[in-house]
Amino acid sequence: MQITVREALRDAMQEEMLRDDKVFVIGEEVAEYQGAYKVTQGLLEQFGSKRVIDTPITEYGFAGLAVGAAFAGLRPIVEFMTFNFAMQAFDHIVNSAAKTHYMSGGQVKCPIVFRGPNGAASRVAAQHSQNYTACYSHIPGLKVVAPYSAEDHKGLMLTAIRDDNPVIFLENEILYGHSFDVPDIIEPIPFSKAKILKEGSNVTIVTFSIQVKLALDVVNILQNDNIDCELIDLRTIKPLDTNMIIESVKKTNRLVIVEEGWFFAGVGASIASIVMKEAFDYLDAPIEIVSGKDVPLPYAVNLEKLAMPSANDLIEAVKKVCYYTI
């Protein structure tokens, strides 16, 4: 059976809304229009306007309302039309949702999911293309999820909705329409569990979200050069499955990290720091990080392509670590 990422997300929300009447969806265009990307399609008809709530164009307003509802015991799913617009709600996410459980000594929970497309799409320019993975991963109190496949989107969304504290669920606009094979029943997937998509012996490639597609293509190309790559899909950025990464590096002795976001203070830099500390003696070459260029993402199609990680960038990085000599 195949379903799209869009259908996987909708099915997860539908199942949890049927299972728990405290779950509701709120955001711009989520009800009558059925979501800017049709992720909430059919939910208004099934659950009504008290549980699928259209809002004015004020992320600060509806995010704050949803955080308050979570403090009161409800389970909001907040859809941002893009995580770029979530900057308007940053105070509620960081200072209220993320911190209150700790500041209350564990007395107040905040079971809320903030979800929507993150990062580049196709020529939507700098103010609609920023990747916020590293930004949210930096904040204590937030769990950060960035899946690739339809099965992982659904399984991790089920887990996110059931979590008693805030989850940042980072989707990708381009992936919404992609179809994947899925089992008949998709169970909740625990956080902090990465997945080895391909076992290998020469080099470990670590990535997440839509960059998994890039890495899969490159792994197949490099097979022709007799470079045997092990590919890890992180799925959850925070908490991070450090054990899987370290065990893989101990086997392959080389590491390349791929992310769409910027290099400085990025996800790749954090992973590299952990591996240098925990598995330094196993490395036969310096760690390579393939990332987006240090510029606001351009609108022009040729410049947008140059600013993003490419297959050639990844191939070059893998060959660099595999052919490294002192």
Curated annotation (Swiss-Prot):
BP term (GO), one: pyruvate decarboxylation to acetyl-CoA
Keyword Oxidoreductase annotated: yes
GO molecular-function terms, A-Z: pyruvate dehydrogenase (acetyl-transferring) activity
Cofactor: thiamine diphosphate
Pfam families, alphabetized: Transket_pyr, Transketolase_C
Domain of life where this protein originates: Bacteria
Binding site for thiamine diphosphate: 59
Keywords from the UniProt entry: Oxidoreductase, Pyruvate, Thiamine pyrophosphate
InterPro entries in UniProt: PDHB_mito-type, THDP-binding, Transketo_C/PFOR_II, Transketolase-like_Pyr-bd, Transketolase_C
Catalytic activity: N(6)-[(R)-lipoyl]-L-lysyl-[protein] + pyruvate + H(+) = N(6)-[(R)-S(8)-acetyldihydrolipoyl]-L-lysyl-[protein] + CO2
EC class: oxidoreductase
SMART domains with a match to the protein in the record: Transket_pyr
EC number(s) given by UniProt: 1.2.4.1
Stored PANTHER family: DEHYDROGENASE RELATED, PYRUVATE DEHYDROGENASE E1 COMPONENT SUBUNIT BETA, MITOCHONDRIAL
NCBIfam families the UniProt entry points to: PRK09212.1, PRK11892.1
Function (record text): The pyruvate dehydrogenase complex catalyzes the overall conversion of pyruvate to acetyl-CoA and CO(2). It contains multiple copies of three enzymatic components: pyruvate dehydrogenase (E1), dihydrolipoamide acetyltransferase (E2) and lipoamide dehydrogenase (E3).
Subunit structure: Heterodimer of an alpha and a beta chain.
Record's protein name: Pyruvate dehydrogenase E1 component subunit beta
Species for this entry: Rickettsia typhi (strain ATCC VR-144 / Wilmington)
Lineage: Bacteria, Pseudomonadati, Pseudomonadota, Alphaproteobacteria, Rickettsiales
